[in-house]
Amino acid sequence: MVFIVTVLVGIAVHIATGNFFTSYNISTLSRAASFAIIVGFGQTIVLLTGGIDLSVATVGQVCGMASAIFMVNYGMNPYLAIIIASLMGIALGAVNGFFIAYFKMTPFIVTLATMQIYKGIVYVITKGMPITGMPENAQNLA
């Protein structure tokens, strides 16, 4: 149903503006929506199994911060930094899974707590400041 409504809105906007379905616009929309789509697939699995994960965006923040630090402070190859940051994301998700599975804790409580912990980690490490000076080849990946 959501897909049908999305297509209908796209058609209506194209009729109104005449330039919605251009290759540039489709490419831009695809890049902008890719993170939400990937997270949506993962969250669908979590919700279908009766759980909820509130820490997804915060895990993304930790991983993004880590990859930026690896590239800016240590001059690491962007692809390697992204792979290491992705492995960190898997490890942080495994922490949630460990507490939920082995201690039989409620997923809502565990992920709410780890979300706050991960936010604190990002804040302490970055001191609330953005990480600047990303290499040019890393900016093209975004």
Feature roles, as predicted:
Residues 2, 20, 60, 111, ...:
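Electropositive phosphate-/nucleotide-binding environments in soluble metabolic enzymes
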Residues 3-12, 41-42, 62, 83-95, ...:
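Generic alpha-helical transmembrane segments of integral inner-membrane proteins
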Residues 107-142:
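Transmembrane helix-bundle core of multi-pass membrane transporters
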